Curated annotation (Swiss-Prot):
Species annotation: Mycobacterium leprae (strain TN)
Reactions that this protein is recorded to catalyse: alpha-D-glucosamine 1-phosphate = D-glucosamine 6-phosphate
PTM comment text: Activated by phosphorylation.
E.C. number: 5.4.2.10
Keyword terms, alphabetized: Isomerase, Magnesium, Metal-binding, Phosphoprotein
Gene name in the database record: glmM
Positions bearing Phosphoserine: S102
Protein name according to UniProt: Phosphoglucosamine mutase
Swiss-Prot/TrEMBL cofactor(s): Mg(2+)
Cofactor note text: Binds 1 Mg(2+) ion per subunit.
InterPro entries: A-D-PHexomutase_a/b/a-I, A-D-PHexomutase_a/b/a-I/II/III, A-D-PHexomutase_a/b/a-II, A-D-PHexomutase_a/b/a-III, A-D-PHexomutase_C, A-D-PHexomutase_C_sf, A-D-PHexomutase_CS, Alpha-D-phosphohexomutase_SF
Family in the record: Belongs to the phosphohexose mutase family.
GO molecular function, one term: phosphomannomutase activity
Amino acid sequence: MGRLFGTDGVRGVANRELTPELVLALGAAAARCLANSGEPGRRVAVIGRDPRASGEMLEAAVIAGLTSAGVDALRVGVLPTPAVAYLTGAYDADFGVMISASHNPMVDNGIKIFGPGGHKLDDDTEDQIEDLVTGGPGLRPAGVAIGRVIDAEDATERYLRHVGKASTIRLDGLTVVVDCAHGAASSAAPRAYRAAGARVIAINADPNGININDRCGSTDLGSLRSAVLAHRADLGLAHDGDADRCLAVDANGDLVDGDAIMVVLALAMQEAGELSSNTLVTTVMSNLGLHLAMRSVGVIVRTTDVGDRYVLEELRAGDFSLGGEQSGHIVMPALGSTGDGIITGLRLMTRMVQTSSSLAALASAMRALPQVLINVEVADKTTAAAAPLVQTAVETAEVELGNTGRILLRPSGTEPMIRVMVEAAEEDVAHRVATRVAAAVSAQGSPLRCWNPDAISGVELRL
């Protein structure tokens, strides 16, 4: 059995890989690991979920695991992942559990666990939980020591008050289209943006348990682009299923990705004296254009492996104030312990109003090099990445790109796929090189399918 935890919790096909039995064991193990220290008294865990159909089943399983280990379950219902992280600290809970597979299809689900204060767990703590899962349930309490279930009636309002602090000025006069991905932010995001003064047009905000992330949200911007143009909006914001991401499109429908958002926010924070150590933290996936834009204004860029958890670790280690990923995970520790798509949207709109600038004008501070990202589904990520044919294709690509571009090949931490990313001075070169390397990856093992780029464009590449 491989490691249970990936880069963003435990994920799998609900009821097949992520079974109620496994989730019950995870809940009990988390309770035993995270709720056995501190002063005597009742132990409490916050539990939330996104609206996908399997969430109700898995919520029941998590609650059974928690309460069977003597921990009270404080149920907050359908809310974004960053809401669960925030509420874990706000309620002074021992830990928090979010049931979500983020941007994944509805057939999947996942378990994310937050430690005290709403911080993501480190590898050692995850390993301890895994050991407890495989070691059995341990001694179970009885009688009054069994955990209880409590519904947190004020959870949504508490969270909305929290995110409202991200907008320091009124957004009156700004029109925004928000694509909620039929996900956890379908209610919270429009409410937060309206409370800040913006005119809000919400789309894909009618979750039925089945339609989450279905041709909408941050993984498919087609409907957002159309709505922005149709309503002549100032911008569009797209969240994923659990709203820890935010991507944007400008008034022309052009993408403003996480890299460009980070550049906009870094410049704003630098101007306000809030960019700690004049440093931005991002991952190896960020476009070279981000590095060039930051270098031109004297901002230091620190790079981590892919995954917001690694960005968070670097932010905490260096006491930095801004970090994120190209995919739209943006983290500002002063405003939350993890990435929050709604807060990102509010800060972006605040900058537009402060400077009386269009989003396109703000985003022009960064000139992105042509980048092609191809996701190749494979049966075995490790074997495919290490295959001689693939390594040869990568080496050939590196020679062709020279010092005017780069190639990055990495297994996904949350899905059965390998990501092929190529940047080059010319778009046709990037496409040609990426397609050739992706074909080599696809030829390994039992190839399933290939598409480009992280579903943002929705354009499939036939290899």
